[in-house]
Amino acid sequence: MYQYTAFDRSFVHQRAAQFRDQLERNLAGTLGEDEFRPLRLQNGWYIQRHAPMLRVAVPYGELSSRQLRQLAKIARVHDRGYGHFTTRQNLQFNWIPLVDGADVMDLLAEVDMHGIQTSGNCIRNITSDALAGIAPDEFVDPRPYCEILRQWSTLHPEFAFLPRKFKIAVTGAAEDRAATYWHDIGLHLYKNAAGEVGFRVLAGGGMGRTQIPGIVVREFLQWQQFLVFIEAIVRVYNRYGRRDNLYKARIKILVKAVSRTPSGRRKPAETRSNSACVTSWASPSTSWCRIASNSSSTD
């Protein structure tokens, strides 16, 4: 799994300290509920009927033993002794008093964890195959590509206020254990006849009240170009997705409404506008390729 750098650790600790200040001002009455609401949501805190709920990010479902023990400590000390793993590989605590929120965020930061982008209309936690890296039917390990997506999407300034939440799943196996057809974007890693690594790209999937499986928008996309292609899709959605109706704001509704023709015209146009970046992303010397080398196995 990806190993946090000194910068990464500094960032999550600063974010925890920032939330402590915001929470203290809210509890003191100097920061109103309307102002505090988006701030707590950006850190994974929901206010539900009986108690707050905290959603903790677990990128592509990987936890170290140290992180798991810290989560258990939070459950024992601040919750009711348990948490809930979600279908999208996050963890939720449902009974933490909000006054304990800052202490909990500090505990998470100690083990390189947080709740950033686990709620709100942004790109959510990147999910993958629960058996990634060990599955016997796996063509390519998807975890390095998940990490690239995680770093790209975290606090992306252009995609912080999308029409609706946006979910991405990646798999590199024959069996779709990541349920990629039911995500806003689904990515299937595989090798073509020439032995080249690439993605089959799906878009427009989703569950909820309108259940629609994703459609294939690119049969084979070279791995060096996958990030600029994903960015183009999200840009089209950010521009053309509905914001007037909460129930029709997901990308699946946009894909269904415009079909392939208009969406196909816009997405390549967006992709061409970023074409200068494609070559740099393909270079082994770029930071994107170094992400994979910074990922290693740990307990």
Locate each region found by the language model.
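Peripheral terminal and linker regions in Fe-S/redox and tRNA-modifying enzymes
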Residues: 1-299
